[in-house]
Regions:
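Glycine/charged-rich beta-loop-alpha catalytic/anionic-binding loops adjacent to active sites
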Residues: 44-53, 135, 178-183, 249
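Phosphate/diphosphate-binding glycine-rich loops and adjacent basic-rich segments that engage nucleotide
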Residues: 137-189
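Glycine-/charge-enriched secondary-structure boundary and capping motifs
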Residues: 1-13, 87-112, 117-127, 132, ...
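Short pre-catalytic strand/loop immediately N-terminal to key active-site residues, enriched for Gly-Thr
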Residues: 55-59, 183-190, 205-206, 253-255
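Small-aliphatic-rich amphipathic alpha-helix that forms the alpha element of a beta-alpha
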Residues: 56-82, 95-106, 195, 199, ...
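Extreme N-terminal cap/leader segments of soluble proteins
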Residues: 1-58, 74, 83, 103-104, ...
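Internal active-site segments that recognize and position negatively charged phosphoryl groups
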Residues: 151-157, 189-214, 218
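A generic local secondary-structure boundary/capping motif
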Residues: 17-19, 27-28, 100-101, 115-120, ...
Length: 319
């Protein structure tokens, strides 16, 4: 058994309840009485998901945000969270808790409980959070398995900022200070918007969050849905900060499309819902961009300016 995919495949023999969705989605979906509960869990590990010298408050914010992103992808309203904390330096822990409180307030997801553990000295610290949400009434909870041929492919926000933000945080990137700060903020404090997920849920056929990279997550959606997805690389939305620092070349776009930590929404919807999707984004003042189409077939295809573009060897982050 090697890698995350093989391990998850082995877990499927245990997670046979329909609520687990075959361990092929961003969250579990559990019917309880007249309510639909959405449950998700993520872990952040020092040296993997955050830098050892990242501010503790930013680490806490990211822990909450990545879970809220999963709830958003299911169109769920945040209900509460539980988390486990690896105890360490008292001052660091106090700053972490301040960031946790700030994030829980920002995303309206109250802390309900959790666990603590004392780590051996010099061990990388890790933190896990389980988020609970409620699905929209009279609306199926979106999955990544229901994209249909003829759908348009959409993404929210802008793509690739966090990767450059990580480089900026490491001092590896040159450019205008204001733009570097903007990019670093996207890495340190992603800001998923559950209200957009809620608004989109009745309109989409498939939806997931972009966490490991736009291309690899689109490929996963295509595989899960048994369809092909064609994306126009030239239509992928980039921020002004990214363009100012990295340019708007095919290479820069490919780098952005294979980066992770975006925590935007990737979704497919019938063409007749285009106006309502744009309206949902407009009401919330959030960018939504059509970047491709769902096709009969399988796999992922890329183009730019109407010409085919070869897929890169690495589509995104692999665990």
């Amino acid at each position: 058994m090697t890698g995350e995919l093989a391990f998850i495949h082995a877990l499927r023999a245990i997670a046979t309840d329909p609520a687990a969705r075959g361990l092929a989605d961003d969250a579990a979906v559990l019917a309880v009485g007249g309510e639909t509960l959405v449950l998700t869990m993520d872990t952040v590990v020092e040296g993997v998901h955050y830098l050892p010298d990242d501010a503790p408050a930013d680490v806490a914010w990211k822990l909450v945000a990545v879970n809220v992103s999963d709830l958003s992808a299911k169109g769920a309203t945040p209900l509460g969270c539980l988390y486990s904390h690896a105890l360490g330096d008292d001052a660091w822990d106090a700053a972490f808790l301040a960031g946790l409180d700030e994030a829980c307030r920002r995303f309206a997801i109250p802390l309900l409980g959790g666990d603590t553990v004392r780590m051996p000295p010099e061990s990388p610290r890790s933190f896990s959070l389980t988020a609970l949400g409620t699905g929209r009434k009279h609306c199926p909870v979106p999955s990544r398995t229901a994209a249909r041929a003829g759908d348009r492919v959409w993404v929210s926000g802008t793509i690739g900022d966090a990767r450059l933000g990580l480089a900026a945080a490491r001092g590896e990137l040159a450019g205008p200070r204001a733009h570097l700060a903007t990019l670093a903020a996207r890495y340190r404090r992603p800001s998923p918007e559950p209200r957009l997920g809620m608004a989109l849920a009745p309109l989409v056929n498939a939806m997931m969050d972009v966490s490991d990279g736009l291309l690899v997550d689109a490929a996963r959606m295509a595989q899960a849905s048994g369809v092909g997805i064609a994306i126009g690389l030239d239509t992928v939305p980039l921020s002004a900060a990214l363009v100012a620092v990295a340019g708007d070349t095919t290479e820069a776009r490919m780098t952005a499309a294979t980066a992770g930590d975006d925590y935007e929404l990737l979704f497919t919807a019938p063409p007749e819902h285009t106006a309502r999707i744009r309206e949902a984004g407009g009401v919330l003042r959030l960018r939504v961009t059509a970047i491709g189409v769902v096709e009969v077939g399988e796999g992922l295809a890329l183009s730019s300016g109407g010409r085919s573009v070869a897929l890169p060897a690495r589509l995104g982050y692999q665990h």
